[in-house]
Amino acid sequence: SVYSGTKGFVLNFSRGLQQELANTGIRIQVVLPAATATDLWDISGVPLAALAPETVMSVEHLVDAALAGFDQGESVTLPSMADIGLWERYDTARSDLFAAMQTGKPAPRLLAL
């Protein structure tokens, strides 16, 4: 839970920096890799060999993909995701949820008690 919470923090922190630095010429990219062949697996007690090999990306491929995403202007790069539209739809839904919460009053379903 600490690992996934940290990833969530890094994503949101990076998004905040992207907004704050939008017109400064400084670009912030956040990379969200899936399983990557690093020592982290063994350190965490889950041997890399326990993962399906086809789901694990090499560090070299991860770095190349992250740099390609940066060169393409991606603010969020998911190195193993072929259909970036999945992320875009998720991100749009996230933004819509945030906007829908800005009503200043309780939702009607919560007042009908």
Short names for language-model regions:
Residues 23, 37-53:
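A glycine/serine/threonine-rich, flexible loop-to-helix segment
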Residues 1:
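Cytosolic ligand/metal-binding cores
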Residues 16-27:
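Active-site-adjacent segment of SDR/Rossmann-fold oxidoreductases
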Residues 93-113:
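Non-catalytic terminal and boundary segments that flank Rossmann-like NAD(P)-dependent oxidoreductase
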Residues 27-37:
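Conserved SDR Rossmann-fold cofactor-binding beta-strand/turn motif
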